[in-house]
Amino acid sequence: MRKLIFMALLMSLLFIGTVFGYGDNGPLYVAYYEKYNITGNTTGDGLVSSTIESITGYIVINNTGTTINDTLYDVWVAVNISNNITGPEVYVNGTPKGVFIESSAPAYTNLPNANTYIHIPILPNNSYVIIKFAIDKSITGVPLIINETYSDTKIPSERLSNWSVYLNISRNVSALPATDTPVSVIMTKYLSNDPNNYGSDTWNFLNITGAIANEGSITLWDGPYFLPGYNDSLTWTGVVINTTKNATITINITGNNTYTNRTGTLMKYGFAVIFFEFNGTKSGTKIEGIYATGYGGVSATKEGPFLNASSGKYEIWYESANVSNKASSYYFNLTHVTIWAVNGSNPVILDPFNITLLIPNSKQTSSPNEILSPGSVWSSTKYAFTFDGIPVVWANCTFKVADENITLINRSINEYSTKYGSSYVVVEEIYVVGSYLIKVTKHIVPDADGTYDIYIVVENIGSVKTPEYVYVYDLIPKNFTVSDEWVNQSSMLIAEGNHTITTNPRYNLSMWWALHAIYPGADGDGNWNDTAEILANKTVVIHYKLNGTGEFYPSDAFIVGIDPTNSLLPTTSPKITTVAGTVENNSEPFLALLTLLVGLGIIIRRVM
């Protein structure tokens, strides 16, 4: 139930987009988003130094019509795409037919000039299409400046401790479409003792005792990542920062950690998820125009022949046309109607577009520019022509979805995360420097022949030398072979070995290395070519070459572990690290200090 409440709250955090041009109530929504994937870190001075990992442009064309009669046809969207580093591609196609990226549009659409046209032949009601492309991230900066500081630099273990978090969020004006652009912000903060959600399981008490903000609404609630019955989560909504104000909040936290070792540990105690949104975008990409037609009907009527008093023949005919709107939700703008008749005496050669068969004075055109509401019918004037034979009357028309039925949205927003709602996550830790602290970074370097050079960099980033026998473990998946093993420098290797695994169907070999004591003072950058640190025995590099067949899965192939007997759990000084979807999932180095093997973030590098 608590998880359901959490998900319901996440859903309530979705922003309502600001509407630009066209109508304001759909039901055809055409939205352009620029979504930011942001990551960063801080040195502990409070300022979160964030970096844009990527910006992605999304064009969403969504038919929210209520019935099947609201199916749209021949949808064209004209877009000028700017500052992109990849071409547009169909990301989601919710239609029964294809979606096409074109360089031009038919003349009948009357669309303005653009460098890209999206063509959707059929767009049923309650269906949508998403086009995406990557944008050059260097065109702008991170839209928000986040500063977070703490009331206390350290807290003791095995007792209740109180500390306050001071958070200030301001606009980075240079990264906004205009200097006066306001930014909407929502923050959800979670306290956590769940290792899978930025927490440590040694917390037996975590509670938010109070919070004060300069604006917006604060709700304390029982979140999903700590024990039931605590105010361990906070939602801050209704926050708008602009030219006259920033957003500030003070959060008071009480916690108790059961860690007992005299040496230190790094304890995650939760995280904050940042949602942001502002009107406009930075790349210069613009939706120039939209054309779509829908479920309408055109009928041609022929009456006659009637007596021509001048000639005494029955040769006078009347023609007319009706255009009906059969949609349930859409209004149509009827722009052009043509009625004409051709000689139908010989059905074998009947061709409505053969001008030699066109009956003189029968072709009539009009430009009604009339809005047809759902269910309404437009009728033409009744036109007369003379023909001593069998005429066939034709009618066609051009109509499009009325502009008032098209809602155009243009905005920037945080990149979406399926787990937290936003990929902009601020991870909060109580950081304690221990006597020694081992950091392991694993690099995968793909070679031109399809093999991989694996470098496991073991560093002591603490202040005291480790004991003898630091054990490093790795697992090799099935269908892979290992060769070219070495340790730099070799004098640090005490022993090594391996054994076959039969308990897991995805792995076939366990490898281990026993290392001599590693000296302190490594910088923790994971560099396998740091000669100074290697010669000083502060860093040890383990190498092997991996060769396999079939598809390569980094998450399956690479696991690393450190013997917990000779490593420390991290002990007490506030530190913040920000992570985002792409980086946190694929290339964030982890401290391998758990009592079991630890899945390590993979760093993939190309050989230059």
UniProtKB/Swiss-Prot annotation:
Membrane topology: Single-pass membrane protein
Alphabetized UniProt keyword annotations: Membrane, Transmembrane, Transmembrane helix
Transmembrane segments: 4-24
Localization terms from the record: Membrane
GO cellular component: membrane
Family according to the record: To M.jannaschii MJ1394 and A.fulgidus AF2028.
Name of the featured protein: Uncharacterized protein MJ1393
Species of the source: Methanocaldococcus jannaschii (strain ATCC 43067 / DSM 2661 / JAL-1 / JCM 10045 / NBRC 100440) (Methanococcus jannaschii)
